[in-house]
């Protein structure tokens, strides 16, 4: 049973990246899945929401060396996967679900000679990220990306039967010299949970209802960029005042732990005495003198108006963009 239609071939995606970017913005895609599930280490649901609405620019495809070389090495990863497994693969392009017009999949490869439906996701990463793949692990955002592809390609969101053994492969070149691959088995319950979360996110887009903020500092940066503070003052309701009270309690606990931590540092430094190193069974401690760094006395520089202006004219002095600062104080009664 046919479950998808082809939106763009792989060759068309290379020739027309602007249309590709537009499609990625229009549909819920595989790279969105991990973000929607809250496991993307670089992007929050709120960031994705505002990207989809065009409030903030989405990262350009190929706008970094990592992305560029990831695409260059995609063929290498696919070829090595075939060499090690004997499974032939082919490029396909962007596929849209026939059963859900809001979901699409920009898949790297389709597997051709398996006894069950399968695809291949090709990844590259640095040696510093090797631990993310150790002992059979798969980074969670990549796991959900592959589940999304299965949801689109197999049409299970509407209850279509799926062939036994169906799944998705993911292969990764680590540090340029280590190759691994994993098979992600088809998991009906996990896919249904993902589809439900994606549908709820899409409804938020339609109704312009932002997802809740997370504990990520990225959300604070995003909100500061979106909201310039030009509206009239607001009244704090009971819920917000209770939130501030909880924050005060947390800050008090943090202060207490900071004091305990500082006491521990002081005791350790006192133990070192005139030594700059101490070694034990579990830990190694160093307390060495660092070279001082040069600093600019801005107050003195501004007094030398001629030199100060010359540095600004030469663009050796630059002013950063202003930012909003959150300050909480007790209200004055009466």
Residue ranges and their predicted role:
Residues 1-334:
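Accessory terminal regions of nucleic-acid processing enzymes
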């Amino acid at each position: 049973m046919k479950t998808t239609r082809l939106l763009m071939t792989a060759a068309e995606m290379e020739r027309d990246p602007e249309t590709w970017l537009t499609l990625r913005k229009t549909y819920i895609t595989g790279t969105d899945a991990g973000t929607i599930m809250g496991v993307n280490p670089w992007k929050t649901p709120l960031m994705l929401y505002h990207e989809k609405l065009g409030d903030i620019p989405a990262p350009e495809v190929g706008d970094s060396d990592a992305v560029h070389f990831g695409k260059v090495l995609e063929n290498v990863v696919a070829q090595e996967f075939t060499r090690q497994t004997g499974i032939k693969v082919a490029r396909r392009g962007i596929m849209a679900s026939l059963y859900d017009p809001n979901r699409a999949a920009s898949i790297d490869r389709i597997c051709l000679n398996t006894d069950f439906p399968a695809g291949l996701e090709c990844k590259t990463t640095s040696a510093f990220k090797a631990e993310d793949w150790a002992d059979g692990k798969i980074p969670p955002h990549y796991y959900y990306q592959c589940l999304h592809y299965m949801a689109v390609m197999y049409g299970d969101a509407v209850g279509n039967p799926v062939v036994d053994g169906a799944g998705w492969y993911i292969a990764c070149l680590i540090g340029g010299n280590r190759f691994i691959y994993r098979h992600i088995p088809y998991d009906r319950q996990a896919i249904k949970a993902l589809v439900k979360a994606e549908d709820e996110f899409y409804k938020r887009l339609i109704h312009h209802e932002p997802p809740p903020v997370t504990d990520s500092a990225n959300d604070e940066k995003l909100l500061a960029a979106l909201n310039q503070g030009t509206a009239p003052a607001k009244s704090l309701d009971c819920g917000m005042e209770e939130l501030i009270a909880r924050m005060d309690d947390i800050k008090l606990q943090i202060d207490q732990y900071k004091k305990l931590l500082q006491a521990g540092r002081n005791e350790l430094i006192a133990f070192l005495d005139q030594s700059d190193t101490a070694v034990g069974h579990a830990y190694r401690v160093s307390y060495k003198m660092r070279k001082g760094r040069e600093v600019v006395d801005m107050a003195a520089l501004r007094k030398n108006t001629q030199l100060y202006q010359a540095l600004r004219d030469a663009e050796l002095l630059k002013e950063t963009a202003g930012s909003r600062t959150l300050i909480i104080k007790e209200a004055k009664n009466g």
